[in-house]
């Protein structure tokens, strides 16, 4: 039988060898694969790239570890290690390591970094990497850095050139198994919770969705675990990397942004997140002037009838009010004049309704809704990040919530109910109004992608045994109900007037047990229904059953669990603060300061 050297010469003469570049030194070599039926494994014969006599003859066997083979024949320099960075063991990324240090011994085999091929220091974040790639991955995930590739997104990442393209380096880290949950666990200790699951939108986590449609990566999700939520109703692990392409999102040339620059580009986004997050930490940090005022107030307690509990309540209410005043001012000013004019115009024509049901209501002349109530414009935070994170989703949802509150406040009849009744109505039906807003802003918010993210999060959490089957079933049912409702509304091609009347009918629902003046609220609902019927008859005279089809969609709103909606869309932004607790402060804002209608996409 011919020797290995003879087989090598025969193959080289037939020009069947492959010339590759060794990434460590940049030297071109020729690798030839010879088959010997009497020997198990693959045999690699490395020759000079000019086809001369082979400089090295190496017999290699494939190891059980994917993408790695070990040498069985050392050369004069010591033990070599042949390592392929592609799972199919192709020779496109060939790396050789020779160690001839006297203290290592001839049988010492070193692991290489799966990302760049440098000498690995151990397993970091789920993959064998060097210290350099470990630190790079940790910084990228913790700071949520966004990178761009100036090439074709297949840059060579090796020991010498790994810093040239941070985008490809990060993609390579993720592709070879580095997980973000390991990074998150280092940020704070894992808390022991009564349930094994955690929240789907924790404030320290990030939901990543690939935005670049040209990326060669396949849509394989990698789940990222979060620390257990302190709320007992925590639902899902949220931080995850999703290769889901948002439909309808324009692919833009990405810009390399550091964390500081990214925050400056998303000014109102970070401001909103910081202000709302501060509500979860009320009383923890105070400025010096505020401390002095508090001390004087505390001293006065000894000479006053005010109790300490009452003082703490006043202190908390003041913090919440100031935080939400700042939150409202962080949003760009828009069309607040419409709301002011509507409220001013109702004076003299509508009597304020208090909690006393004996007070008669004088019905306002004219329609319940005017043309100014039809416009419902939602502008998403700009710019849209390359990787959609939970704070971006949270602020988008909070803008929709603010916009819905602004819409309700602009209705004179709603204002006529008085502050307490108005707050009770919004507390009771904010989830229904928010869900209708999701359907109306389906394309602007790219709701389909957000829901797909939640579904993949559930699948991965179940596979990793992070929640029970019953809990997963509950969440999946809610998400599918939400998706089904929005899809059905989109198919009906509902216009702005129809959405306005549907929301008015939902808002003035008198069947909640905590409401007062139910008869007055019912009159508003009846008036909204009559106006809705007149509009449908005039606008769609040939569609006899359109009104019935639209009204029959409203019962599905009652099936939406407000707690789960809150967990999915708002928990990552406001922590343990409940939507019910912030609604009064939103509705008590001054009209000049309150405005979440930012000029932008018109629905």
Swiss-Prot record:
Region of interest: Required for interaction with NRIP1: 584-603
UniProt xrefs under InterPro entries: NHR-like_dom_sf, NR2C1/2-like_DBD, NR2C1/2-like_LBD, Nucl_hrmn_rcpt_lig-bd, Nuclear_hormone_rcpt_NR2, Nuclear_hrmn_rcpt, Znf_hrmn_rcpt, Znf_NHR/GATA
Any one GO BP annotation for this protein: cell differentiation
DNA-binding region: 110-185
Transmembrane segments: none
Record CDD domains: NR_DBD_TR2_like, NR_LBD_TR2_like
Pfam families for the chain: Hormone_recep, zf-C4
Segments for region (Required for interaction with KAT2B): 1-178
GO cellular component terms given for this protein: chromatin; nucleoplasm; PML body
Gene3D superfamilies recorded: Erythroid Transcription Factor GATA-1, subunit A, Retinoid X Receptor
Modified residues (Phosphoserine): 197, 215, 581
Subcellular location: Nucleus; Nucleus, PML body
Keywords recorded for this protein, A-Z: Activator, DNA-binding, Isopeptide bond, Metal-binding, Nucleus, Phosphoprotein, Receptor, Repressor, Transcription, Transcription regulation, Ubl conjugation, Zinc, Zinc-finger
Residues covered by the NR LBD domain: 348-590
Single GO MF annotation: sequence-specific double-stranded DNA binding
Zn finger limits (NR C4-type): 113-133, 149-173
Keyword Transcription regulation attached: yes
Stated family: Belongs to the nuclear hormone receptor family. NR2 subfamily.
Function: Orphan nuclear receptor. Binds the IR7 element in the promoter of its own gene in an autoregulatory negative feedback mechanism. Primarily repressor of a broad range of genes. Binds to hormone response elements (HREs) consisting of two 5'-AGGTCA-3' half site direct repeat consensus sequences. Together with NR2C2, forms the core of the DRED (direct repeat erythroid-definitive) complex that represses embryonic and fetal globin transcription. Also activator of OCT4 gene expression. May be involved in stem cell proliferation and differentiation.
Name of this protein: Nuclear receptor subfamily 2 group C member 1
């Amino acid at each position: 039988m011919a020797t290995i050297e003879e087989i090598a010469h025969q193959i080289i003469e037939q020009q069947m060898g492959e010339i590759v570049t060794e990434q460590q030194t940049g030297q071109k070599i020729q690798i030839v694969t010879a088959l010997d039926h009497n020997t198990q494994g693959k045999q690699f014969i490395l020759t000079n790239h000019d086809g001369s006599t082979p400089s090295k003859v190496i017999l290699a066997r494939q190891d059980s570890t994917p993408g790695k083979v070990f040498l069985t024949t050392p050369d004069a320099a010591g033990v070599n290690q042949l390592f392929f960075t592609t799972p199919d063991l192709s020779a496109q990324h060939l790396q050789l390591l020779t160690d001839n240090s006297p203290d290592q011994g001839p049988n010492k085999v070193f692991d290489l970094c799966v990302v760049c091929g440098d000498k690995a220091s151990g397993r970091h974040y789920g993959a064998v990497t060097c210290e350099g790639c470990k630190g790079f991955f940790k910084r990228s995930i913790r700071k949520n850095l966004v990178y761009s590739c100036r090439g074709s997104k297949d840059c060579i990442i090796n020991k010498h050139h790994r810093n040239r393209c941070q985008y490809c380096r990060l993609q390579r880290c993720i592709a070879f198994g580095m997980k973000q949950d390991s990074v998150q666990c280092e940020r704070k200790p894992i808390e022991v919770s009564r349930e094994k699951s955690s929240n789907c939108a924790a404030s320290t986590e990030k939901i990543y969705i690939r935005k670049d449609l040209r990326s060669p990566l396949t849509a394989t999700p990698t789940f990222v675990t979060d620390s257990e939520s302190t709320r007992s109703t925590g639902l899902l692990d949220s931080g995850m990397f999703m290769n889901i392409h948002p439909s309808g999102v324009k692919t833009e040339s990405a810009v390399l942004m550091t964390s500081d620059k990214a925050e400056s580009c998303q000014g109102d986004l970070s401001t909103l997140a910081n202000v709302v997050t501060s509500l979860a930490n009320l009383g923890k940090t105070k400025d010096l002037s505020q401390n002095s005022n508090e001390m004087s107030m505390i001293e006065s307690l000894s000479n006053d009838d005010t109790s300490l509990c009452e003082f703490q309540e006043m202190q908390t209410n003041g913090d919440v009010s100031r935080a939400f005043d700042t939150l409202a001012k962080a949003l760009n000013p828009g069309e607040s004049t419409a709301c002011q004019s509507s409220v001013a115009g109702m004076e003299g024509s509508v009597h304020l309704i208090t909690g006393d049901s004996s007070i008669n209501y004088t019905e306002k002349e004219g329609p319940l809704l005017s043309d100014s109530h039809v416009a419902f414009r939602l502008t998403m935070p700009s710019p849209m990040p390359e990787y959609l994170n939970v704070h971006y989703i949270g602020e988008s949802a909070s803008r929709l919530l603010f916009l819905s509150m602004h819409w309700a406040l602009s209705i004179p009849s709603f204002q006529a109910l008085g502050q307490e009744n108005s707050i009770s109505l919004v507390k009771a039906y904010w989830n229904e109004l928010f869900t209708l807003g999701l359907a109306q802003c389906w394309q602007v918010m790219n709701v389909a992608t957000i829901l797909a993210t939640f579904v993949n999060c559930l699948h991965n959490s179940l596979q990793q045994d992070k929640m029970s089957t019953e809990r997963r079933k509950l969440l999946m049912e809610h998400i599918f109900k939400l998706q089904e409702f929005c899809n059905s509304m989109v198919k009906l091609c509902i216009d702005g007037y129809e959405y306005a009347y549907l929301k008015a009918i939902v808002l003035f629902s008198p069947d909640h047990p905590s409401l007062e003046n139910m008869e007055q609220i019912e009159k508003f609902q009846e008036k909204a229904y009559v106006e809705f019927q007149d509009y449908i008859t005039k606008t769609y005279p040939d569609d006899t059953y359109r009104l019935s089809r639209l009204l029959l969609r409203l019962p599905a709103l009652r099936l939406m669990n407000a707690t789960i909606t809150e967990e999915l869309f708002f928990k990552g932004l406001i922590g343990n603060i409940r939507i019910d607790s912030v609604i009064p402060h939103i509705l008590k804002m001054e009209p000049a300061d309150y405005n979440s209608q930012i000029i932008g996409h018109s629905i």
